[in-house]
Amino acid sequence: GRDAYIAQNYNCVYHCFRDDYCNGLCTENGADSGYCYLAGKYGHACWCINLPDDKPIRIPGKCHRR
């Protein structure tokens, strides 16, 4: 696993305000835990700890939300 911003489709982060939202999102996806990283590179976004390698993470480049 890896520590990273979990990504939605099209390389977009999950925006957040509360740690419990991110912890739930991350653990549902197999991570050990997660929290809301405030005022980071992508604003307030969910950061996961030990997220499985098969789950999408935010990579450099644009968020292509449709």
UniProtKB/Swiss-Prot annotation:
Q: Which gene encodes it?
A: AGP-SYPU1
Quote the protein name from its UniProt record: Neurotoxin BmK AGP-SYPU1
Mainly resides where?
A: secreted
Which keywords accompany this UniProt record? Disulfide bond, Ion channel impairing toxin, Neurotoxin, Secreted, Toxin, Voltage-gated sodium channel impairing toxin
Domain comment from the record reads as follows: Has the structural arrangement of an alpha-helix connected to antiparallel beta-sheets by disulfide bonds (CS-alpha/beta).
Q: What domain of life is recorded for the organism?
A: Eukaryota
Source organism of this protein record: Olivierus martensii (Manchurian scorpion)
* Similarity comment: Belongs to the long (4 C-C) scorpion toxin superfamily. Sodium channel inhibitor family. Alpha subfamily.
Pfam families in the record = Toxin_3
